[in-house]
Amino acid sequence: MATFKSNRNPEFRSKFSEDIFNLKYSHAGCDTWQQLSSVLVQDVCGDLREGEESLMTKDEMSQLTKYITELKFVPGGRYLYYAGRKNRYYNNCFLLAAEDDTREDWANLSWKSESCLMTGGGIGVD
């Protein structure tokens, strides 16, 4: 049985894993696993977070990028998907409530529910 080796993403051990990456996570600016790893660490921990200080030093970010690139640590799919994208919905659980038992509040709850669901979030209603 031949061993799979990709020229573009040598980290992947099977064509199936590379196909999943290409179908679900690859996009402009993150065409390879290595690019996605670097952008993800910058987005979440680095200086790409507008108006906020980096959560990690450059050395720590470099080490984390290396771990992700080598598949020693793989972040959740939601983080992989949103890396480098304009809109990011890392947290996707919402708890909603109707404040008063009125038509208006129930209509507002419906609107909030639809808005949450359109971002791919899950909802709970208290």
Language-model-derived ranges and their functions:
Residues M1-D126:
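Extended catalytic cores of very large enzyme megasubunits
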